[in-house]
Amino acid sequence: MQKEMKMIKDEDVHFDLAVKKTPSFPHCLQPVASRGKAPQRHPFPEALRGPFSQFRYEPPPGDLDGFPGVFEGAGSRKRKSMPTKMPYNHPAEEVTLALHSEENKNHGLPNLPLLFPQPPRPKYDSQMIDLCNVGFQFYRSLEHFGGKPVKQEPIKPSAVWPQPTPTPFLPTPYPYYPKVHPGLMFPFFVPSSSPFPFSRHTFLPKQPPEPLLPRKAEPQESEETKQKVERVDVNVQIDDSYYVDVGGSQKRWQCPTCEKSYTSKYNLVTHILGHSGIKPHACTHCGKLFKQLSHLHTHMLTHQGTRPHKCQVCHKAFTQTSHLKRHMMQHSEVKPHNCRVCGRGFAYPSELKAHEAKHASGRENICVECGLDFPTLAQLKRHLTTHRGPIQYNCSECDKTFQYPSQLQNHMMKHKDIRPYICSECGMEFVQPHHLKQHSLTHKGVKEHKCGICGREFTLLANMKRHVLIHTNIRAYQCHLCYKSFVQKQTLKAHMIVHSDVKPFKCKLCGKEFNRMHNLMGHMHLHSDSKPFKCLYCPSKFTLKGNLTRHMKVKHGVMERGLHSQGLGRGRIALAQTAGVLRSLEQEEPFDLSQKRRAKVPVFQSDGESAQGSHCHEEEEEDNCYEVEPYSPGLAPQSQQLCTPEDLSTKSEHAPEVLEEACKEEKEDASKGEWEKRSKGDLGAEGGQERDCAGRDECLSLRAFQSTRRGPSFSDYLYFKHRDESLKELLERKMEKQAVLLGI
């Protein structure tokens, strides 16, 4: 007996020495005997021991083989299950435990291990769940270190799971996810290659004696795809104290924090981990954490663009059924969340909170018809038009309607003749600032838009588009009074002013009124010292474009569409040959030839084409130069007579000589053309003789007119020359002229 007591004391001394050399393990991990096995290796290789130094891992004591108990099954040395935790025994009972071990030796039974001394803990019921099924793993392979960083959340203390004490695997100074590696998430890492980070073989649970969750057969994997993992387990014990009797045969387990119950212990454990701030399931795309795997699967649908739940009313899709049900409350009359100020109902609490905040700040924009709230006042006004129709703002002067008050305000400035924007170059006034900006480009000489047919350049793109319609030879708009046709509708509208007594355009300096804007613009040059129209053949400059045209005809012999002084044919010259001269004559500034009150008369020239005043003007405005009231040269007052240019007024005595020279040149050209036609057997010789006679008659009539006039005027001569022509002949000649120009 004394011999046996001595052996027990020796074992106690040996046990004390082993305890001093062994670190304290958490209560959830039990030491495992390693008799007959290779010594346990460090869980991390040499390359990774530096980053994982905070885990404070130390090798187990080397003399654990001296322990009298080993874990052996019946005839098998492989451990198949976790060791059962034993309640703590008092040190006085250790002798009895040792004696029992000796008796078990004698009977051939497997020995029980001696536990490390631990503080007293409450005893647990035999029906405890081992959370090895939800254990966490480390992926040791460096291939998984390329993942995305995951949001870190510290552990929150709770009544169920108190603040953890410092342990080798969960140190206090570090959060739950320590900064081991920027791509590594503790307690486990999710490979970025898989679409869903967790599968049925992600967790490798231990095999408890009575597993609560049945294990499914794992698929066979090759050695290349298997991942080497080291297990770090966390256990939460769920005993019968969580059980709640709800009646019937169904068992439910209730959370003591929020009193939420579950039919499965596993679901309750997952719920408790959520209270502690643990969300083990992470999204590989955005790094968002979730408590349950099903929540992660639902979240992954948002990244895949899949929304299986669709609203039948507005066809809006959602990823979850709960979101669809909450959305359907908007289409129903049931609004559970009501405003305490105005009583308006809302489907969501967030909408009610935002609505009440507007009441507090006084920024609510609520429709009085349907009660809808809008972020801005402009959106509310736009919405009111659906109930009341579009708001119309009527002009009290002309009964025009406008959609916006700003449009009506700009329109009223025209009736009041208010033009606040004045050009500093020419003094023209405008109602809108952008009109002044467009006009200023004419003074700068900027012409960026060019016609692709005739090469004429324009300042504005709209003017160029309007000009291109001239080349189409399509005049769809016709005046019902004079049967004149126009390319554009607005040109016809401006033409109709000619047939009325209204003269809306008035000069503010002299009070003279005009029925067209371009006539007023040309008149304004008379009050200024500017002479923008310059002759190409001499240094002469003119205020009006019409004066320049007359100067070119009289002084330099440049007739309509031709350069007779250069010996070119009349009216048959290709448009490309005269494009350079014509572009130089074209100016953006309009001209005024209607200051004297004259009747609209057709113009006829010796080449059989019609001349409409200034032929350098646009086609749709050429025919309107002489459409004014009748005029008599002798009866017109001196103040209203046409202002002639300096070349005609100062050198009027040389005008007949210049005209005689021009007539001689025309006769020579006509005789040459007649001789060519006869040599070729042309049957149109009679027409040439008629044109020759017409040229001689024109020259003779001009001489008679100059001899009877003290102050010769070329415009008066044109009036007497063409006063007997009819409008029908003018239109026919104009169509012939356009056909020649277009090569038809």
From Swiss-Prot:
Tissue distribution: Expressed in immature and mature dendritic cells (DCs). Not detected in other blood cell types.
Subcellular location per the Swiss-Prot or TrEMBL entry: Nucleus
Keywords: DNA-binding, Metal-binding, Nucleus, Repeat, Repressor, Transcription, Transcription regulation, Zinc, Zinc-finger
Sequence motif: PXDLS, positions: 590-594
Cellular-component GO terms for this entry: nucleoplasm; nucleus
Effect the entry attributes to changing residue 647 to A: Decreases interaction with CTBP1
Record SMART domains: ZnF_C2H2
Residue spans of biased composition, Basic and acidic residues class: 213-228
Alphabetized Pfam families for the sequence: zf-C2H2, zf-C2H2_6
GO molecular function: DNA-binding transcription factor activity; nuclear estrogen receptor binding; RNA polymerase II cis-regulatory region sequence-specific DNA binding; transcription corepressor activity; zinc ion binding
Region (Disordered): 206-228, 603-627, 664-692
Record note on what altering residue 592 to A does: Abolishes interaction with CTBP1 and in part relieves transcription repression
Zinc finger (C2H2-type): 253-275, 281-303, 309-331, 337-359, 365-387, 393-415, 421-443, 449-471, 477-499, 505-527, 533-556
BP term (GO), one: negative regulation of intracellular estrogen receptor signaling pathway
Region (Interaction with NRIP1): 455-744
PANTHER family referenced in this protein's UniProt entry, alphabetically: GASTRULA ZINC FINGER PROTEIN XLCGF49.1-LIKE-RELATED (PTHR47772:SF13), ZINC FINGER PROTEIN 200 (PTHR47772)
Function in brief: Has transcriptional repression activity. Acts as a corepressor of ESR1; the function seems to involve CTBP1 and histone deacetylases.
Record text on subunit structure and interactions: Interacts with ESR1 and NRIP1. Interacts (via PXDLS motif) with CTBP1.
Name of the protein this chain belongs to: Zinc finger protein 366
Native organism: Homo sapiens (Human)
